Every structure is written in structure tokens, then in C-alpha cells.
């Protein structure tokens, strides 16, 4: 019985579709000319991981400092992918005010899974950002 539980757990984890759904892996954030993108913000996420990282995309270059996001992007990002050897710092209010959080290289298909204080989450909460790569 003790061997059966870990075996069933391993089987269940393998059977689950990719935890990152349709989100690109951080290594894929490169342009055709070889330069890299620091991060991509996506407007749509979904309870199903396979439907995340869709809709309009905001690509952020290394060194981008946006205390105010472009028109239509404030408080709309629901999924996020950060490139290899990069990190993005986000703020909940324009002008780099409010709550803050750093996301390192990786795929974050559902920002509602990341807490912002006691009652909030980061889905539709990003109003400012700074992205850098090493």
C-alpha cells in the first residue's frame, strides 16, 4: 500500500496537462533577430490552463520602466511570462504606488493565484512595471 500511493500520485501528475497551458516557456521570448523580450503580459486567463496566455499581448523590452502603462493596459493583465535571466517588478497603482511584487523568469498563466495583500490577487491589478534582464 505504501508504494501504491506515490505511484498513483506520480501517475496523476503526469496525466495533468501542462501546468503552463498555452503560455510560452521563458526561453521562447526571443525575437527573430536574436534579441530577447523581457516579459509578455496577456489580457486573458481562464480557469483552464490551456486557455491562458491568450488575447492581446503587451511585450516589454529589457530596461523598460513604465510608471504608467499604455492606454488600455492598466489593470488588464491576467497572465504573465518573464524571460530567462529577467525579472519584472509590478505595482498595483499608477506612478509606481501601492502594492508591489517581483516575478522572476517563468510562466504565470493565472495571476489570480498570486496574492496581493490579504484579500487581493494580481489578476487585473498591474498598473506600473519595471523589467530588467541580467
Swiss-Prot record:
Topology of the protein relative to the lipid bilayer: Peripheral membrane protein
A Pfam family per the record: Syncollin
The UniProt record lists the keyword Disulfide bond: yes
Subcellular location: Zymogen granule membrane; Zymogen granule lumen
Signal peptide as annotated in the record: 1-21
Domain of life: Eukaryota
PTM comment text: Contains intrachain disulfide bonds.
Entry annotated with the keyword Signal: yes
Keyword tags: Cytoplasmic vesicle, Disulfide bond, Exocytosis, Membrane, Signal
Knockout mutant characteristics: Mice display reduced rates of protein synthesis and intracellular transport of secretory proteins. According to PubMed:15040787 mice lacking Sycn display atrophy of the pancreas associated with an elevated amylase content.
GO cellular component: zymogen granule membrane
GO biological process, one term: exocytosis
Complex formation: Monomer and homooligomer; most probably hexameric. Interacts with GP2.
Function (record text): Functions in exocytosis in pancreatic acinar cells regulating the fusion of zymogen granules with each other. May have a pore-forming activity on membranes and regulate exocytosis in other exocrine tissues.
Protein name per the record: Syncollin
Gene behind this protein: Sycn
